[in-house]
Amino acid sequence: MARITVEDCLEVVNNRFELVMMASKRARQLANGVQATLDNSETEDKPTVLALREIAARKIDNALIDEVEKAERERAEREALEWAAAEVVADEDMSKNDD
């Protein structure tokens, strides 16, 4: 496994603070099951290292991170609506059985 350094990533992202924000957001996404843009089967890197590898390889940028965050938010909202609808149906079924 090639070692990833902050300097490698700073060639892609000029600001250290922006790099930290990008890497932390992406690592959180990877830890939550989002598909990586690099093959991780051989190295099995932890999400933080994998996020830095993706940044250094220019596989991700803020636009991709924001797109994934938006998709995850929409998925969570859709799931919450489905649960709420299922509860309403269950409540209606229970009230029909009480009659």
Curated annotation (Swiss-Prot):
Q: Which reaction does it catalyse?
A: RNA(n) + a ribonucleoside 5'-triphosphate = RNA(n+1) + diphosphate
Keywords attached to this Swiss-Prot or TrEMBL record, sorted alphabetically, are: DNA-directed RNA polymerase, Nucleotidyltransferase, Transcription, Transferase
One Pfam family it belongs to: RNA_pol_Rpb6
Highest rank taxon of the organism: Bacteria
Q: Which terms does the UniProt entry file under GO BP?
A: DNA-templated transcription
Q: Which SMART domains match?
A: RNA_pol_Rpb6
Q: SUPFAM superfamilies under this entry?
A: RPB6/omega subunit-like (SSF63562)
Q: What EC designation does it have?
A: 2.7.7.6
Q: Offer an example of a GO molecular function term for this protein.
A: DNA-directed RNA polymerase activity
Which EC main class describes this enzyme?
transferase
Q: Which GO terms describe its cellular component?
A: DNA-directed RNA polymerase complex
Q: How does it assemble?
A: The RNAP catalytic core consists of 2 alpha, 1 beta, 1 beta' and 1 omega subunit. When a sigma factor is associated with the core the holoenzyme is formed, which can initiate transcription.
Function of this protein?
A: Promotes RNA polymerase assembly. Latches the N- and C-terminal regions of the beta' subunit thereby facilitating its interaction with the beta and alpha subunits.
Give the HAMAP family listed for this entry.
Answer: RNApol_bact_RpoZ (MF_00366)
Task: Give the UniProt family note.
Answer: Belongs to the RNA polymerase subunit omega family.
What protein am I looking at? DNA-directed RNA polymerase subunit omega
Q: Which organism is it from?
A: Stenotrophomonas maltophilia (strain K279a)
The taxonomy runs: Bacteria, Pseudomonadati, Pseudomonadota, Gammaproteobacteria, Lysobacterales
Q: Which gene encodes it?
A: rpoZ
